[in-house]
């Protein structure tokens, strides 16, 4: 929504005590030049917009599909590749049980996420700490969640407590939320964590609270 705050809040949980807040104007507030925020002074005629990839990707996908020189293959996993003097041959599996694919190309680029199999196979590495590979992301539908907070909503909420730390991002400003659950050092993988329990600790809700 145009009037939804772009703020970043820090709380003991999404519904818990607020510790601090970075105030960032909503799209509607940016029309008032007297309203200030950390990004209101950027030298650009187009102010920042908080738009999740679930809205952007269909637009980009449709544009890519309209280009005759592109072929998009979904639900396909590259398993290995071989490089020679003239290019690269990659082998992939159809995740819906179809025939294996042999793909001949000039280049292979690892753009398949933080835990990218392709990136690892070609030896490309991150710089810094690969924390992104240890974040369990869950998109939830919780239309009643905003009823449980006593303060103004925020675009991003950092949940910090001894039980679980994570982030909650507003997707549509009403009912859709992206919950990031950060794995602890001793947790070897996502299977080591009860996802539902972790989400409830980050949100600060009990077992009776319903979300999908």
Language model features by range: what are they?
Residues 1-66, 82, 143-146, 156-162, ...:
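Active-site-adjacent segment of FAD-dependent monooxygenases/related oxidoreductases
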Residues 11, 91-95:
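A generic structural motif
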Residues 39-51, 90-92, 118-119, 180-182:
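Membrane-interface helix/loop caps of multi-pass membrane proteins
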Residues 62-63, 89, 107, 111-212:
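Conserved FAD-binding catalytic core of PHBH/FMO-like flavoproteins
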Residues 74-89:
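A conserved short coil-to-beta-strand element within the FAD-binding core of flavoproteins
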Residues 96-107, 111:
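Core beta-strand elements of the Rossmann-like FAD/NAD(P) dinucleotide-binding domain
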């Amino acid at each position: 929504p145009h009037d939804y705050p772009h703020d970043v809040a820090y709380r003991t949980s999404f519904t818990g005590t607020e510790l601090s807040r970075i105030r960032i104007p909503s799209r509607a507030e940016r029309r008032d030049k007297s309203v200030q925020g950390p990004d209101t002074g950027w030298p650009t005629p187009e102010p920042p917009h908080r738009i999740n990839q679930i809205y952007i990707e269909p637009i980009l996908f449709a544009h890519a599909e309209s280009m005759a020189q592109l072929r998009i293959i979904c639900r396909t996993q590259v398993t290995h590749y071989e490089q020679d003097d003239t290019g690269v041959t990659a082998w992939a599996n159809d995740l819906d049980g179809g025939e294996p694919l042999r793909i001949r190309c000039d280049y292979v680029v690892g753009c398949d996420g933080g835990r990218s199999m392709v990136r690892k196979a070609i030896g490309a590495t991150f710089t810094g700490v690969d924390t992104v590979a240890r974040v369990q992301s869950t998109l939830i539908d919780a239309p009643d969640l905003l009823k449980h907070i006593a303060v103004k909503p925020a675009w991003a909420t950092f949940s910090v407590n001894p039980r679980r730390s994570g982030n909650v991002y507003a997707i549509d400003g009403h009912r859709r939320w992206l919950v990031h659950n950060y794995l602890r050092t001793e947790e070897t993988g996502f299977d080591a964590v009860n996802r539902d329990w972790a989400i409830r600790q980050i949100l600060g809700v009990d077992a009776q609270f319903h979300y999908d």
